[in-house]
Amino acid sequence: IGDTAIISAPDEWVLFKGREDGFQQQVMFANTSDWRFDTPDANHYVQFIDRATRGDIDDDLYNKHLRPIKELSDKWWQGQMQKSKGSLPVSMVKYWGELMGMAGGSVRPPLAGLSQSEKDELARDLRVLRDQIPAVVGDTR
């Protein structure tokens, strides 16, 4: 693997699994993590992926700056997938982006947006995380 086949998966757990199994993922499949997890002042996700795809998996960087936000993302991603019976959680991703300072906009039918209580909960979850790890999450509204 790496000489005749290139692995590209959208989740960083593959990088850790590759280290265990003796292969190195050389590229990262496009995902929403870089713009949901990073800010202009703290681009830890991009730094981690850049290094990991060159074979330098920095456990300390991941555990300190990325694991908490990844766990929050997994909680919301899985919850929204269950709620929508398997649809990608586009409304959650768009609103998360808004909380990170980007324009998200609304989803198109037949998808439904987050309820106000879900928006409030996600904003609160991100705010709590920001307070715990200031360099990870940008200001939330």
Predicted feature descriptions by range:
Residues 67-109:
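Conserved short secondary-structure transition element at the edge of the structured enzyme core
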Residues 109-141:
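Long, low-complexity C-terminal extensions of enzymes
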Residues 1-77:
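Catalytic alpha/beta core domains of metabolic enzymes, predominantly
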Residues 60, 93, 122:
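Conserved, mostly hydrophobic/aromatic
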Residues 8, 34, 82-85, 111:
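Glycine- and other small-residue-rich loops at beta-strand/loop junctions that grip anionic moieties
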Residues 62, 86-90, 115, 119:
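A structural signal for well-ordered alpha-helical scaffolds and beta->alpha junctions
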